[in-house]
Amino acid sequence: MDTMMLNVRNLFEQLVRRVEILSEGNEVQFIQLAKDFEDFRKKWQRTDHELGKYKDLLMKAETERSALDVKLKHARNQVDVEIKRRQRAEADCEKLERQIQLIREMLMCDTSGSIQLSEEQKSALAFLNRGQPSSSNAGNKRLSTIDESGSILSDISFDKTDESLDWDSSLVKTFKLKKREKRRSTSRQFVDGPPGPVKKTRSIGSAVDQGNESIVAKTTVTVPNDGGPIEAVSTIETVPYWTRSRRKTGTLQPWNSDSTLNSRQLEPRTETDSVGTPQSNGGMRLHDFVSKTVIKPESCVPCGKRIKFGKLSLKCRDCRVVSHPECRDRCPLPCIPTLIGTPVKIGEGMLADFVSQTSPMIPSIVVHCVNEIEQRGLTETGLYRISGCDRTVKELKEKFLRVKTVPLLSKVDDIHAICSLLKDFLRNLKEPLLTFRLNRAFMEAAEITDEDNSIAAMYQAVGELPQANRDTLAFLMIHLQRVAQSPHTKMDVANLAKVFGPTIVAHAVPNPDPVTMLQDIKRQPKVVERLLSLPLEYWSQFMMVEQENIDPLHVIENSNAFSTPQTPDIKVSLLGPVTTPEHQLLKTPSSSSLSQRVRSTLTKNTPRFGSKSKSATNLGRQGNFFASPMLK
């Protein structure tokens, strides 16, 4: 019984303590909360008063600005009037000075010393007096013409419409249309003559031809001194507009468009009517698009235009690329998932730090640069040889590696800056693309005199690369093969090898000595040339990926699945050279083993990119690899 009473008392004491704890401090806290609300109310009231005061000040400033604009207009008109008055006054002053000079000469030449004027002097003075009004009128007439030209060409003039021009044969000048005036009505494109005769001289052509020409009319007027007839000769010629190089290349046409093919005269490929991405996507990792309604305006990556509020847009779940529904087929491929973080120092990490864990393992900056270069750079002379602006390259690199969204490379005017960005990224990696460990293997494979053994050794070295390096190298080689096949760039395999040799091959150690650097500089281009000589089918296999865990309703596939440029056939099989007993006597002992290794790496049972799926998917069938349902 005592134990029960003791337990009940303990429970009662605990309840009392808890009630005291709960009752303590509540009033103080509520009072403090009320005081805080009162402080915020007062601040809100003060802010409201200040807002009203600033609105009044803004209205006063707008009124003052309007008044000052009116005053400025009147001041400009007054300045024009004063300029004309000054010109007339200067002309009158010059005339009076000439008359005074004539009178001075007349008086100084008089040697008689007589105070009275002779008859000749009186007649001369009378002539000057009579000729003054006529000369003044003539001078005013000439000056009025000069004033008209001056008012039209004056930079300080307020009225600059120039919409009405009076045709005057006395105005002789050669005038070329400015860029601003080309966009106005056609009636203003004729300056030195009526528009009627000029229109007859123009040949009837397409709208494109008319839009690329301007009319320049030259009129020469000859006025004889003896009062003979006045002769006028007019010539009319068409001059093409000056265009920037970016407008020639920035048409945003894909690589496999018909118009681009006709101009480049490349090897034949599959023709399609739909617009595709700059490279094929057969077997590539495709975008996993989801539709959303735009709340905050965003920019479409393929076309660069803004997607306005309330419009429907598509966004990839992996790489966060945003596009219009009609631009989905032009999004860059392959789809590279966006990284959560970047290395501490921009651009100075390992290549694996810039790629995701899904295949193909290619840095996003490489994919976007290559796609933009192939869209509008394959007609640019000296691609990758001409350097871009260092400041632009640095800013783009910051945006790619620091900002979560993808910067719009289509808004970069200089395509060489994008090329420099790609080279700068690959050059500033802590380890080159071909790695320090395999540097010597690649150089030794490139220097093998026998072509079959050299290619087999190159296959072996590529197969030993880390997956990120191998995938990036394959993507880059496919791109450089396209650049080499374009005749407009004037960058063949040898030139590209000289440019990319130090960038992707580099050296076997981080800080080589000068002697090693000189030796490697001669060997690096050979490695790139040998890599570019490998067939396109070999590099394309690394771009193929099994589409796992992707909703088929979201898959958007390009119809141009097999439209990449064809690489010329080489003289060696992918599985190594065909040998005979006599031929094997001339080979090195390692050639057969290298060929056997290449043969084993190219079998169809080899897993691609370390796929996590348990069942192998047949990627060797013909046609498209994935279904292409339309997005609803």
Swiss-Prot record:
The family database entries (InterPro entries) matched by this protein are listed as:
C1-like_sf, PE/DAG-bd, Rho_GTPase_activation_prot, RhoGAP_dom
Annotated region (Interaction with SLC26A8) at 106-285
Q: Which SMART domains match?
A: C1, RhoGAP
In this UniProt entry, the residues modified to Phosphoserine are 149, 154, 157, 164, 170, 203, 206, 214, 257, 387, 410, 600, 628
Kindly state a single biological-process term from the GO annotations of this entry.
positive regulation of cytokinesis
Give expression by tissue: Highly expressed in testis, thymus and placenta. Expressed at lower levels in spleen and peripheral blood lymphocytes. In testis, expression is restricted to germ cells with the highest levels of expression found in spermatocytes. Expression is regulated in a cell cycle-dependent manner and peaks during G2/M phase.
Read off the domain note: The coiled coil region is indispensible for localization to the midbody during cytokinesis. The phorbol-ester/DAG-type zinc finger domain mediates interaction with membranes enriched in phosphatidylinositol 3,4,5-trisphosphate and is required during mitotic cytokinesis for normal attachment of the midbody to the cell membrane.
Give the protein's recorded name. Rac GTPase-activating protein 1
What organism does the UniProt record list as the source? Homo sapiens
> What is the name of the gene encoding this protein?
RACGAP1
